């Protein structure tokens, strides 16, 4: 019996041809041994010998023909063409990858720190990461929004997996904040519009001469001014005496 493209014998294992284009690593999927003539030569996908049908391996490159099928089981082919399903499921694929694999031939893995999102990579343990195959993480300061990164503790951050934070000056908008994670601020002069503010977070200002329109203002935040001839439109003054 001779090896593929080699002179000399191979022995029963067909290994160690050691020639260019021979059976060694170029077999790709036949493992350490190679197929010897007259059975068939190594193919890039799997070696064909009368062991299993070509259909179960997804077919050997170049066709099986007289080879009569694939050597051994699908597992010995080093991954069969046509997907893991034809090889018998996830088991024959060697299980799941270390980090939450979502492979077509594996079931979702249990949660591993290596597949957690950055904000949950530590502190919560195995139930932390917000992955498709993991449970939501508990709240950590590292995954809090900037405005709530301090002062509120673990219940601060406005994250999908965290409780809303309490109101802090650092996370309020400049004057009169209306943030989703803060209570409405009380009205401060610094956050009122120039004169008579009508902000959503401020009470209406009382009417001041400085914030009234020139004469007789009728603003939504000011009381009607006393009627003065100087501020009435021509011929339109309806001053009560």
Curated annotation (Swiss-Prot):
It comes from Mus musculus. Sequence repeats lie at residues 35-38, 41-44, 47-50, 105-108, 115-118, 133-136, 143-146, 161-164, 171-174, 181-184, 191-194, 201-204, 211-214, 221-224, 231-234. Disulfide bonds: none annotated. Belongs to the KRTAP type 5 family. In the hair cortex, hair keratin intermediate filaments are embedded in an interfilamentous matrix, consisting of hair keratin-associated protein (KRTAP), which are essential for the formation of a rigid and resistant hair shaft through their extensive disulfide bond cross-linking with abundant cysteine residues of hair keratins. The matrix proteins include the high-sulfur and high-glycine-tyrosine keratins. Keywords: Keratin, Repeat. This is Keratin-associated protein 5-5. GO terms for biological process: hematopoietic progenitor cell differentiation. One of its GO terms (cellular component) is intermediate filament. Residues 35-234 are annotated as: 15 X 4 AA repeats of C-C-X-P. Interacts with hair keratins. The keyword Repeat applies. It comes from the Eukaryota. The keyword Phosphoprotein does not apply.
């Amino acid at each position: 019996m001779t090896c593929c493209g080699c002179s000399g014998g191979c022995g029963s294992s067909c290994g160690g041809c050691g020639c260019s284009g021979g059976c060694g690593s170029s077999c790709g999927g036949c493992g350490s041994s190679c197929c010897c003539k007259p059975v068939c030569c190594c193919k890039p996908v799997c070696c064909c010998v009368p062991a299993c049908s070509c259909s179960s391996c997804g077919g050997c490159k170049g066709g099986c023909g007289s080879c009569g099928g694939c050597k051994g089981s699908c597992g010995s082919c080093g991954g069969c063409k046509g997907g893991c399903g034809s090889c018998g499921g996830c088991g024959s694929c060697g299980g799941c990858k270390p980090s939450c694999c979502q492979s077509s031939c594996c079931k979702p893995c249990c949660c591993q720190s290596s597949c957690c999102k950055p904000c949950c990579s530590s502190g919560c343990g195995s139930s932390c990461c917000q992955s498709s195959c993991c449970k939501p993480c508990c709240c950590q300061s590292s995954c809090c929004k900037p405005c709530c990164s301090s002062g509120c503790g673990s219940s601060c951050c406005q994250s999908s997996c965290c409780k809303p934070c309490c109101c802090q000056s650092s996370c309020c908008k400049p004057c009169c904040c209306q943030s989703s994670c803060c209570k409405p601020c009380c009205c401060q002069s610094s956050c009122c519009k120039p004169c008579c503010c009508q902000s959503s977070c401020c009470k209406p200002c009382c009417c001041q001469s400085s914030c009234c329109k020139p004469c007789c203002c009728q603003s939504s935040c000011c009381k009607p001014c006393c009627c003065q001839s100087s501020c009435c439109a021509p011929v339109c003054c309806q001053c009560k005496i």
